[in-house]
Amino acid sequence: MTSSSPRHADPDENPYVEAPPTDFEPVGALSEDEATEQASLLRAAIREHDHRYYLEADPLIPDETYDRLFTRLQELENEFDLPTQNSPTRRVGGEPLDELATVEHVAPMRSIDNATEADAVREFDGRVRKGLDAEGFDSDAVEYVCEPKFDGLSVEVIYEDGEYVRAATRGDGTAGDDVTEQVRTIRSVPGKLRGDPPSRLAVRGEAYMPRDAFKAYNEALMERGEEPFANPRNAAAGTLRQLDPSVVAERPLDIFFFDVLGWENDAEGDSPNRPATHWEEFDTFDAFGLRRANRVERVDDIEGALDYRDRLMADREDLNFAIDGVVIAVDDRANREALGATARAPRWAFAYKFPPRTATTIVEGITVQVGRTGRLTPVAELDPIDVGGVTVSRATLHNPAEIEALGVNVGDCVRIYRAGDVIPYVPEVVEKRSEGTYVFPETCPICDAPVERDGPLAFCTGGLVCPAQLERAVEHWARRDALDIEGLGPERVQQLREAGLVESLPDLYDLAVDDLAALEGWGETSAENLIAELAATRDPPLDDFLAGLGIPDVGATTARALAAHFGDLDAILDADEDALRAVDDVGPEVAESIRTFLDNAENRVAIDGLRERGVDPESVDVETGDALDGLTFVFTGSLSTTRGEAQAHVEAHGADATSSVSGNTDYLVAGESPGRSKRDDADAEGVPVVDEEEFAGLLAERGVAWPPEE
């Protein structure tokens, strides 16, 4: 059985492909058949839009329209309990896993022999020609395919009947970690193949983090006081090994596919339609909607491959993905089979690697930077050195544990590594010229508060008493995605602190025009403007207030989810970790991070100080209470409200609302056109099924109104 191109992807048949309407009628107005048909149209259209965006770089619709289509599909699937196995909505992540299982590969994922010298590549060519001659092939006809050697994480991805079914890391080459749910969240990995793929297809790809996205993500990590990734490869590898797929979904991973590992057209495993050459396999990738690199070439001799490598190396800084060389592979599959492989590597491929971008220099000093959350980052001050055409005078040492592992100190000769947007760092001490290892300070270099170790990291315990942390906190409060206060950039924040006008976050709201106008570089107009900006933030939306506090792991998206779930600040301040975990986008780690921040006495003083000065966030209209405490509800079908509103309503009164029926469920509330699977689960578990009228009666008995009052 093969999979044909989705019929709904044709713009003539699918209204959501070109100029799609987004003024949808209420979900509750649809029958189950109508919802199923609309969801099918939306899935096909979203896949088409993903293909146009990620593979063709030619989007048909703006991001805002795409988001509306995606949200509508989520609503339909939730309200009507529609199957979502390979729906685009699965990309937002699923339930956290207990561990990564180990799975065997369809075919060995071998490594590739490599070298940085051209002569070694020519020797490889000689072995290929000799081997082909010995097997009776015409070695003069050999052609090579040249492609980038990606510096990411290699994965095997399997499709059956065109549907995505599994993904695994390379592991030891024979078996790897099952990362099916993690890879599913990568937008450029199709959940359903286009065209006419074989009944079973296994492909090899390289998951990576684009360089621009890596830079932005690292900046966000450092802004939150978290350890940045050393390089894009570490970012990709660390992300795919996350047990929580929702964490993976939040990180900007991408993928290139570059090889076919298995191709089966029927139960006997015959493969008459598999391309005869690697070059032709690239055409099938395009036909199936599998993203591949464009910088590939086919050459008829090894000198052409060497020339390709030199040209690609010259352009590497302009690429938005990290590469560390090129792969040169025999094109013809029959030739490949004749050449075979060793236990470790194929005889028909070779990697011509780029020289490393490193240099050696002397550490002239070590300074310690203080981040917004108090994280202390040691930095090596260097004798300036040219590394790959860029003068480097500073390099990160990451954290105290890294210093201890390196054994580095002032005066040592160290190697510096730099690549693209990667922060220059010290991978090794080349020559030890000092005695001992740098001793990390026990007090903050800025405020002298004690330093506290947390695993490999170190933190200043001074909180907002620390001038550095205070300045970063004020800057964060004023950010566009928080309170959006114009006129509070780093230089002005430092000036206000040094003038003694701002010694805590609440002090911002004690500022007066006369105080500001007297400062150097200020005038009455600029002072009045800042005071007006501050006054406009005294009744901020709850989510902006939360985002502005700078709670680790809580950005704008999570702040909105918290605000929508709890409704007011006091409810959030009182919520324990279990209550926090019930919020969309909040997993165990984020819940712990929120609770730790809110339990900090200095942070509570700052929050109370803001409220005392009239900065009190607007509450979201959500009722609270414990009338339903101890009950667990599951909703299915169409109700008089959306399912999300129903869940939020019962949770606001102390109940739990889950997405699936289990032995812990007290009631399955079935609206119109309920999902069959949940009703079957309820029957199997002995869970009572009630309609909306009965549900309203249950709530009324406990003093809770239904539907929720406006």
Swiss-Prot record:
GO terms for molecular function: DNA binding; DNA ligase (NAD+) activity; metal ion binding. PROSITE patterns: BRCT, DNA_LIGASE_N2. Its cofactor is Mg(2+); Mn(2+). SMART domains: BRCT (SM00292), HhH1 (SM00278), LIGANc (SM00532). Its EC number is 6.5.1.2. It catalyses: NAD(+) + (deoxyribonucleotide)n-3'-hydroxyl + 5'-phospho-(deoxyribonucleotide)m = (deoxyribonucleotide)n+m + AMP + beta-nicotinamide D-nucleotide. It is an enzyme of class 6 (ligase). Residues 1-36, 657-689 are annotated as: Disordered. The active site is at K149 (n6-amp-lysine intermediate). Pfam families: BRCT, DNA_ligase_aden, DNA_ligase_OB, HHH_2, HHH_5. Belongs to the NAD-dependent DNA ligase family. LigA subfamily. DNA ligase that catalyzes the formation of phosphodiester linkages between 5'-phosphoryl and 3'-hydroxyl groups in double-stranded DNA using NAD as a coenzyme and as the energy source for the reaction. It is essential for DNA replication and repair of damaged DNA. This is DNA ligase. It comes from Halorubrum lacusprofundi (strain ATCC 49239 / DSM 5036 / JCM 8891 / ACAM 34). The lineage of its organism: Archaea, Methanobacteriati, Methanobacteriota, Stenosarchaea group, Halobacteria. The gene is ligA.
